[in-house]
Amino acid sequence: MDFANIASQLNAGTILPEGIVILTLLGVLIVDLILGRTSARWIGYLAIAGLFTSIVALYFQWDNPNPISFTGGFNGDDLSIVFRGIIALSAAVTILMSIRYVDQSGTPLAEFIAILLSATLGGMFLSGASELVMIFISLETLSISSYLLTGYTKRDPRSNEAALKYLLIGASSTAVFLYGVSLLYGLSGGQTELSAIANGIATAKVGQSLGLVIALVFAIAGIGFKISAAPFHQWTPDVYEGAPTPVIAFLSVGSKAAGFALAIRLLTTAFPLVADEWRFVFTALAVLSMILGNVVALAQTSMKRMLAYSSIAQAGFVMIGLIAGTQAGYASMIFYLLVYLFMNLCGFTCIILFSLRTGTDQIAEYSGLYQKDPLLTLGLSIALLSLGGIPPLAGFFGKIYLFWAGWQAGLYWLVLLGLVTTVVSIYYYIRVVKMMVVKEPHEMSDAVKNYPQVRWDLPGLRPLQVGLVITLIATSLAGILSNPLFTLANNSISNTPFLQATINSHVEAQNLLLLPKLDSVSQSQPSVDSTAKI
């Protein structure tokens, strides 16, 4: 047996960041078994240290000349590195905001962190999976861990209800997605690698067959569930309202990023022959998500439900970059997910702090908060205004890049719809900000009138403060200093070969569509000679 050949085919060094997360997960469980409840004081910091070590390992893998591992099952290219970094960073910030919250709920912190690390592991593997079996295993690891996290506070009936709904709808979407990829397997002649699937379908000459279209629709249904796109969003409001707040913070960023990573890799690699069809479907999803998410958010009275519908709308904005299919489109998509990480987690950190001190998440109860807790008011205001796209915050530049990429790609009416729905979203974000900064004492809510003294020295509150300050600074400065982040996003696209091939073929197809129009214009104009004769 040639072990050197086997080692070169496995290329296990590519998944070193995931290996570090696995070791961190095992370390958390072992330390908890040995020390018991006394480990809760610092076990969260152990997990955060492991996640940041994983991010450092990702940094050193940038522009890896040999990113393929597990005989083609995993691709550690620069695109996957960015998405894996987003997921790991979102998990680290989630742990910061979870320590006090989980302790107050009376549930073990070590088990919570272990399940969260499992979800992180699934999301990181999903970001680079380039083979059907790897995709399914990674997707299930992320999904099952998410179900467990959603129902982690067993004493809360709302958490149990949210977990059951999430499980039932998630299992159904997984079954639909699995049926779609099984059709791909059959149409390609038994191939499981995404690139081999495309070649197999082209060889079998079934590029426009009904079976391939059905496979595409079912695959998009599974992806739509993961990114909370309408009309696959039914689980989102109930799960966001009932699940523990740190869990939905991770789902809104880490799980969504993994879903978009899967969408890019699966659709561009396995479905190149029906590229126009999947772009049309995603255009419909983007329109529905932007309209439904922003309009329904206007009527919400719960802060978490409002952010649930906001998350649906944000998915619609990100899809503009995917539909554009250009270098600028994919780069703006990744840039927006990077800044969305900071502004969304900043908002959820503030919601956790408010709920810990008042026991409610009703929007009306935030009235007059500025007079009792200026830092929390500032953090939540910056996060909401950034989500709305107010300059000069990070969300403004994220939306500008997305809309510019869409306009350059000819998606004029989709960009105009995005602008209109952005204006709608600004209304319900500013409504909350205005409510928090009222000055009249009689306008204060009962929760704010009875607001406890702000103390950061209580157990578990210092990590929350650190998480709030870090995400607040990042949200405030990521827009003004956006060039490094956009360069990172742009380089991740430029250094990913399969995506460059997809972009070039899309540009060539667009040019071929423009040629007849240019010919007709040139034929309609009189030549110089004929004009001279006249």
From Swiss-Prot:
Q: Where are the transmembrane segments?
A: 15-35, 42-62, 79-99, 109-129, 132-152, 167-187, 210-230, 244-264, 280-300, 306-326, 334-354, 378-398, 410-432, 466-486
**What topology does it adopt in the membrane?**
Multi-pass membrane protein
Where does it live in the cell?
Cellular thylakoid membrane
User: Which keywords label this protein?
Assistant: Membrane, NAD, NADP, Plastoquinone, Quinone, Thylakoid, Translocase, Transmembrane, Transmembrane helix, Transport
* Gene Ontology CC, one term: plasma membrane-derived thylakoid membrane
Which InterPro entries does this chain map to? Answer: NADH-Q_OxRdtase_suN/2, ND/Mrp_TM, Ndh2_N
Report the superkingdom from the record.
Answer: Bacteria
Q: Which GO terms describe its molecular function?
A: NADH dehydrogenase (ubiquinone) activity; quinone binding
Substrates-to-products reaction catalysed: a plastoquinone + NADH + (n+1) H(+)(in) = a plastoquinol + NAD(+) + n H(+)(out); a plastoquinone + NADPH + (n+1) H(+)(in) = a plastoquinol + NADP(+) + n H(+)(out)
Q: What is its main location?
A: membrane
Q: Which GO terms describe its biological process?
A: ATP synthesis coupled electron transport; photosynthesis, light reaction
Q: How does it assemble?
A: NDH-1 can be composed of about 15 different subunits; different subcomplexes with different compositions have been identified which probably have different functions.
Family designation: Belongs to the complex I subunit 2 family.
Name of this chain's protein: NAD(P)H-quinone oxidoreductase subunit 2
Which organism is this entry from? Nostoc punctiforme (strain ATCC 29133 / PCC 73102)
Q: What is the lineage of its organism?
A: Bacteria, Bacillati, Cyanobacteriota, Cyanophyceae, Nostocales
